[in-house]
UniProtKB/Swiss-Prot annotation:
Cofactor: Cu cation
Lineage: Eukaryota, Metazoa, Chordata, Craniata, Vertebrata
Any Gene Ontology biological process: ATP synthesis coupled electron transport
Protein name: Cytochrome c oxidase subunit 2
CDD domains: CcO_II_C
Originating species: Batomys granti (Luzon hairy-tailed rat)
Residues annotated to bind Mg(2+): 198
Pfam families: COX2, COX2_TM
Annotated binding of Cu cation A1, by residue: 161, 196, 200, 207
UniProt KW Oxidoreductase keyword: no
Record family assignment: Belongs to the cytochrome c oxidase subunit 2 family.
First-tier enzyme category under EC: translocase
Amino acid sequence: MAYPFQLGLQDATSPIMEELTNFHDHTLMIVFLISSLVLYIISLMLTTKLTHTSTMDAQEVETIWTILPAVILILIALPSLRILYMMDEINNPVLTVKTMGHQWYWSYEYTDYEDLCFDSYMIPTTDLKPGELRLLEVDNRVVLPMELPIRMLISSEDVLHSWAVPSLGLKTDAIPGRLNQATLTSNRPGLFYGQCSEICGSNHSFMPIVLEMVPLKHFENWSASMI
């Protein structure tokens, strides 16, 4: 989860988020190098009155500043395309969960189980227990098995929503009349928080998402107790 004054991304919990973090660092380094070069050239132009007459009309320079940006864009695009294809892969999910966005709560249905469905509302600040997080706790958490591929089917009952869990690298739009899907795999157990990430009305800020990733045995015990 995020912390006050945090500058970086949240700790990666899924393979996809690890790839996104590496891509972020890769792209940021390229941007940093380009920005440093541009600032260096600007400082030279401001601190010297000398000019090189041949650079005002130099075919070689124009060729270089055409080819070099193209190479840099390719270096950014190739890892990005690889991650996009990874995010679209569906590797035989062991579990499918359907989530529907409402104003202003989420409902979940475990499609592999009969009658295993519930609504998930934010817990009001006045009802929080010591140690719980304001605007992020819910009355019913989404319990899922860790280290296994899970498919999420996401849609909406009313307006546009967006189901997002940053530490898993997930953000999928919930669109009325359309069923979007995403896959997630958690590398470790724990609680992972997210929120609706699409403006959906006056209580948009009060639609938290809480995933509880547990070992498979604990998940089986939980699902048996819920049915």
